[in-house]
């Protein structure tokens, strides 16, 4: 509940071993093997978990790299819309390991809605900026799900977390977390994360 409070979400999942696993849980909750996703390329910091060598590829997703706006180190909105209209992805992802500017979440959310896709924002490296309100909350801008690592800019224990306002996605992630991908609840890590969240209040 503290994670949900800090990130202004209706649902939060903390039974997540890492940020990479947060992405996998989210991919599994939205997609099935063979579905198409559009992801930020590595040239603008797109994370390996969104690509073929990472969990998106291991899960069997069809991965297409988004066109880039090299001046702002993010996706090119006009070209992304053309690509999404052509490919009809199940999921579009945004965010990454290197972030010079805030990403155009609202514009990408509009594209996702237009083509019937969901939008995942990977906040592994920005979640502290979001918790501290230095950057806008992706959920407020139209992201369906936000994934994160809890030990980078958030300053918590090793692990991951997922926040969403979508009850359907939250229910699927709950079942993926247990009994799907984890078999125990790490009380010590959860307590450490709770203390971290209290620091952000």
Language-model region placement:
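Conserved PLP-enzyme active-site core in the AAT-like
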Residues: 1-201
């Amino acid at each position: 509940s503290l994670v949900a409070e800090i990130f202004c979400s209706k649902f939060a999942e903390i039974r997540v071993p890492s940020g990479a696993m947060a992405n996998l849980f989210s991919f599994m909750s939205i997609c099935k093997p063979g579905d198409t996703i559009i992801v930020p390329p590595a040239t603008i910091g797109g994370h390996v978990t969104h690509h073929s060598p990472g969990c998106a590829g291991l899960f069997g997703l069809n991965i297409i790299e988004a066109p880039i706006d090299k001046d702002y180190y993010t996706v090119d909105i006009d070209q992304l819309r053309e690509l999404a209209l052509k490919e009809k992805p199940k999921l579009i992802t945004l965010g990454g390991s290197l972030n010079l500017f805030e990403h155009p979440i609202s514009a990408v959310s509009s594209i996702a809605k237009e083509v019937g896709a969901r939008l995942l924002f990977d906040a592994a490296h920005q979640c502290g900026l979001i918790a501290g309100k230095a950057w806008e909350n992706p959920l407020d801008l139209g992201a369906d799900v936000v994934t994160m690592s809890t030990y980078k800019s958030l300053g918590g224990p090793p692990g991951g977390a997922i926040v969403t306002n979508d009850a359907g996605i939250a229910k699927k992630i709950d079942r993926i977390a247990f009994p799907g991908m984890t078999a125990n609840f790490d009380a010590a890590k959860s307590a450490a994360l709770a203390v971290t969240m209290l620091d952000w209040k």
